[in-house]
Amino acid sequence: GPPLLDLRAPFERALRGGRAEWYRNRYVGSSHISAMRTQPDIAGPNWNNSGLGPNTNVGGFAGTTWAMMEAGGCPVELTYELETIARNDFHGTLPGAFTAHPKVDPSTGELHAMVYAWAEWMDHVQYVIVGTDGRVRHTLDIPLPGMTMLHDMSLTERYAVVYDQPCTVDLELAFAGRFPFRWNPEYGNRVGLLPREVTGRAATAADIIWIDVPLGYSFHPMN
């Protein structure tokens, strides 16, 4: 199936002295996996009733191992052995979607994310900051003219960077049961610089500096 709608199994291996000592992989629990196994659904909140489990990335933060995905799914907490524990919306503080590729600020230890949920949010994305305690401490909705496939973000000392790129949701494809994104050059391409600090107040979407750039798509920027 398409990558965003597929089942994936995270894996890990232990290396010592140039040799692999063990290897394991597991399916991440989800409503879909539970139904196929004729088991009860996994525990935890499912804000958009998605049947999919996180299928894109695994990372550790705030003492927890998380399986993550973009486009709306709730993160799933895993054990060290990659067994599914439950969905975990950062202990009840995440209002909706998350991402597969958050960024840790090395100076504060906080986790930053640009997130989208194409089926639920068609006119905005959301900036999320997770504190070092593993709880969301700040969110900001960022209006967009359409729903771009927001796969990643960048984080600098002064800015959180949002990529508003010409790969956008096509509802005809979605209703036909196909991969819901397509190349859309008429949409344009721009990069938004959201100030992380504004004197005397929190930054808003109106503070974003938008810069038009040539047509293209960046899955994973690097700075």
PLM segments and residue spans:
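Beta-propeller domains
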Residues: 1-223
